Amino acid sequence: MDNDKYLKGTTTVGVVCTDGIVLASEQRATMGHFIASKTAKKVYQIDDLVGMTTAGSVGDAQQLVRLVSVESQLYKMRRNESMTIKGIATLMSNFLNANRYYPMMVQLLIGGVDKNGPAIYSLDPMGGSIEETRISATGSGSPMAYGVLEDQYREDIAVKEGLDLAIRAIHNATKRDSASGENIDVVVITKEAFKRLDPEEVKSRRALLN
């Protein structure tokens, strides 16, 4: 049996900004009370300007990443244009709902920038999909992350400030949630590019919070 399916526990956040979005997560994976990994990947690139965060079962999440990545590329080949963020979220929602009697134990954030601007959608294991117009957090550390996000988010926030807000939110969650910890992985998506921040830059920004 694949042990990856039992690696759980996470904090992920998404921040909608005026010029893009920020997706971030910590990198601890737990198996019960055991820290199974300190470098778990939880923020994935789905398309050129689309990313996805995963909280919950690592095995289920990786299967979903492969599925939606392939479907997105096939759509682009057939239509000669990228699928919208809403389209990708709907595709994932339909797949999760079709498997609702054998649910994949994941919470997802799908976000990016398309012709309609920046957007983030949150999805639950049953396929419920909600467009998040401001902020979102998933996983066991989300209550602590929301405390920071709700307090410091502004409607006019740009990605330069949004990435620091995301780092602060996850940093705060790791202090109280035993299933969240280690390094923080941060992705910034604008209409120009999908950029994963260098780990050393994230560490430097995080150090300023202590």
Swiss-Prot record:
The reaction(s) catalysed by this protein are: Cleavage of peptide bonds with very broad specificity
Q: Which SUPFAM superfamilies match?
A: N-terminal nucleophile aminohydrolases (Ntn hydrolases)
Give the activity regulation note: The formation of the proteasomal ATPase PAN-20S proteasome complex, via the docking of the C-termini of PAN into the intersubunit pockets in the alpha-rings, triggers opening of the gate for substrate entry. Interconversion between the open-gate and close-gate conformations leads to a dynamic regulation of the 20S proteasome proteolysis activity.
User: Which residues form the pro-region?
Assistant: 1-9
> For this protein, what is any one GO molecular function term?
threonine-type endopeptidase activity
Catalytic machinery residues: 10
Q: Which InterPro entries match?
A: Ntn_hydrolases_N, Pept_T1A_Psome_bsu_arc, Pept_T1A_subB, Proteasome_bsu_CS, Proteasome_sua/b, Proteasome_suB-type
**Chief subcellular location:** cytoplasm
Recite the UniProt keywords alphabetically. Autocatalytic cleavage, Cytoplasm, Hydrolase, Protease, Proteasome, Threonine protease, Zymogen
Which CDD domains does the protein's record reference?
A: proteasome_beta_archeal
Gene3D superfamilies in the cross-refs: Glutamine Phosphoribosylpyrophosphate, subunit 1, domain 1
Its Gene Ontology cellular component terms are:
cytoplasm; proteasome core complex, beta-subunit complex
Signal peptide residue numbers: none
Entry EC number(s): 3.4.25.1
Describe its function. Answer: Component of the proteasome core, a large protease complex with broad specificity involved in protein degradation.
Listed under subunit, the entry gives: The 20S proteasome core is composed of 14 alpha and 14 beta subunits that assemble into four stacked heptameric rings, resulting in a barrel-shaped structure. The two inner rings, each composed of seven catalytic beta subunits, are sandwiched by two outer rings, each composed of seven alpha subunits. The catalytic chamber with the active sites is on the inside of the barrel. Has a gated structure, the ends of the cylinder being occluded by the N-termini of the alpha-subunits. Is capped at one or both ends by the proteasome regulatory ATPase, PAN.
Q: State the similarity comment.
A: Belongs to the peptidase T1B family.
User: By its UniProt entry, which PANTHER family does this protein fall under?
Assistant: ATP-DEPENDENT PROTEASE SUBUNIT HSLV (PTHR32194:SF0), METALLOPROTEASE TLDD (PTHR32194)
The protein's name is: Proteasome subunit beta
**Which organism does this sequence originate in?**
Methanosarcina mazei (strain ATCC BAA-159 / DSM 3647 / Goe1 / Go1 / JCM 11833 / OCM 88) (Methanosarcina frisia)
Its organism's taxonomic lineage begins at:
Archaea, Methanobacteriati, Methanobacteriota, Stenosarchaea group, Methanomicrobia
